[in-house]
Amino acid sequence: MFFVTPAYAEEAPAAATGTDAHAAPAAGEVHTETGVAEGEHARGPFPPFDSTTYASQLLWLVITFGVFYLLMQKVIAPRIGAILDQRHKRISQDLEEAGRLKAEADAAVQTYEGELAAARAKSHAIGSAARDAAKVKAEEDRRTVEASLSEKIKAAEARIADIKAKAFADVGTIAEETAAAVVEQLIGSTAAQADVAAAVAAAKKEV
């Protein structure tokens, strides 16, 4: 749709008059024309390139551009801005949530490391206490065993001394009897018991 300029309006009635002249055939004749005189197609330019319609074309271009600009400003741009704002807010919320989760994870890691260090220290302390207790118990057991062995050794030594004393006593008696028998065999008479005992005692001292 175009606005009609005055120049185009002046040309239009002339063209219409020529067309009407050809549009009324005589009675009984067959009309075979298309309503355009021969050679009229080459006279008029293509409407978009017609300089007489530039003003209306520019007017409609300005109107179309204005409508498009208003549509962009009032409808499309606000929607795009709202979408961008919504995405920006969502991204900001996601970043804040990620930061919060990271802080919680760092705190959990620090807590875990602290508890692990405390558990290690406690285990070392328990191990040291157990080793110390084991050393004390082993020392007490060693002393108890040594005391028991010492008592047993003393008892054994006393018994051995008693056995030795008894053995020496028996040996003295046997020696006296043997010496008396030997003297009797040698001299043919029995020696005095006191002399035999004195001789055996002197022999023990020499041994």
UniProtKB/Swiss-Prot annotation:
The lineage of its organism: Bacteria, Pseudomonadati, Pseudomonadota, Alphaproteobacteria, Hyphomicrobiales. The keyword Disulfide bond does not apply. The chain crosses the membrane at residues 53-72. It comes from the Bacteria. Keywords: ATP synthesis, Cell inner membrane, Cell membrane, CF(0), Hydrogen ion transport, Ion transport, Membrane, Transmembrane, Transmembrane helix, Transport. One of its GO terms (cellular component) is proton-transporting ATP synthase complex. F-type ATPases have 2 components, F(1) - the catalytic core - and F(0) - the membrane proton channel. F(1) has five subunits: alpha(3), beta(3), gamma(1), delta(1), epsilon(1). F(0) has three main subunits: a(1), b(2) and c(10-14). The alpha and beta chains form an alternating ring which encloses part of the gamma chain. F(1) is attached to F(0) by a central stalk formed by the gamma and epsilon chains, while a peripheral stalk is formed by the delta and b chains. It is found in: Cell inner membrane. Pfam families: ATP-synt_B. F(1)F(0) ATP synthase produces ATP from ADP in the presence of a proton or sodium gradient. F-type ATPases consist of two structural domains, F(1) containing the extramembraneous catalytic core and F(0) containing the membrane proton channel, linked together by a central stalk and a peripheral stalk. During catalysis, ATP synthesis in the catalytic domain of F(1) is coupled via a rotary mechanism of the central stalk subunits to proton translocation. Belongs to the ATPase B chain family. PANTHER family: ATP SYNTHASE SUBUNIT B, ATP SYNTHASE SUBUNIT B', CHLOROPLASTIC. GO terms for molecular function: proton-transporting ATP synthase activity, rotational mechanism; proton-transporting ATPase activity, rotational mechanism. It comes from Rhizobium etli (strain ATCC 51251 / DSM 11541 / JCM 21823 / NBRC 15573 / CFN 42). It is a single-pass membrane protein. The keyword Transport applies. This is ATP synthase subunit b 2.
